[in-house]
């Protein structure tokens, strides 16, 4: 009888606790934690086109927070905007980072369309893109949202795709309106504008929302500027106002956060309801005004002009700067991580997205305000190198660097930026070369990226998404010697 070698015991699956945010990369995005919005990874693929911003399964409240294009992920819940096509909504968690569309009460949604819950459906905000670009901040693309639920205005869909062109488009792309109040919000400029557009433009306002629509998100090469609404995530009863860029959510809506204009950007207004955000930015770096009673929806203030600006700015110009459009999506009750993004080529601190809950639970990274060209921390530094940190404990955690900034031709950061060179980090970056890290970038190849981010760019890789509680890190660092992992 021949001797048989004993097979080694298989390795156990590595995962995080139920409150942890998601791992995974390359298109899939990781599973969300308990309050997490799930991974908002966006697949890159060879053409980058139609790369959905959806990701793994969400947690208990995170279900269906992905904005996947084609096939439609998640189903709309009673008060969620979602359903059909590339629905995003579902549960209380709402969207992951990047161009996720919020759902449930969160409304946040980060990059692309924001909406969900009472604010009217984001929907149709899959990060589809052109033939070669990842579409970057395209909203819509490939089908649109199924439509409205009881209190939802139904969003995007139809012709309101924001896909980029074959030249790498990125940036806002076309209009991403939709819904009763939406429509007409032109996001994005010509020839790959990248940072010129917002990542999503206005999401349609819901039944009780004034929201979205109307606000121009820049255009051409100069990008935002003025009232570059970017992704107006009007939500709730207060609605979001044309140039509002914040991702309001739940009942409060994003009405409070206005978009700064001019070359200096400027900070936005505060949040509308209870959970006000502490603004550390201001000036050219923009402040982080967040909105949302139940959740914040990404940053708010939108810088304009050439200096980009802070917050989830939809602004930015040829010089890049914090032209991100929505930071991390507001997830669950905690709102999004990340926060505003530093503007200008020198970056700057930006504001750290903080609410009563995220400030208590944020752990990845540790309330780092960073800024500068390398970004880091909750702040997403602007400038060409982008950077940007992950979300907090309960943030939806998707979108790579949770609302990275960047944009312009040099890319950098994630955000809605992404010019010819695309952008790294989170957000809806993209461009001809795609963006590494999270976001809805795509580029020529897919590729990974840690955390909930989804890669893009030729080499993949990129920054990781928001992670969960520290136990998640401990789990990843431990290596039990008793398991033969060969």
UniProtKB/Swiss-Prot annotation:
The keyword Repeat applies. Keywords: Disulfide bond, Keratinization, Repeat. It comes from the Eukaryota. Substrate of transglutaminases. Some glutamines and lysines are cross-linked to other loricrin molecules and to SPRRs proteins. Contains inter- or intramolecular disulfide-bonds. Residues 451-486 are annotated as: Disordered. Signal peptide: none annotated. GO terms for biological process: keratinization. GO terms for cellular component: cornified envelope; cytoplasm; cytoplasmic side of plasma membrane. Expressed in the epidermis of the ear (at protein level). Major keratinocyte cell envelope protein. Transgenic mice expressing a C-terminal truncated form of loricrin exhibited, at birth, erythrokeratoderma with an epidermal barrier dysfunction. 4 days after birth, high-expressing transgenic animals showed a generalized scaling of the skin, as well as a constricting band encircling the tail and, by day 7, a thickening of the footpads. Transgenic mice also showed retention of nuclei in the stratum corneum. The mutant loricrin protein is found in the nucleus and cytoplasm of epidermal keratinocytes, but is not detect in the cornified cell envelope. This is Loricrin. It comes from Mus musculus. The gene is Loricrin.
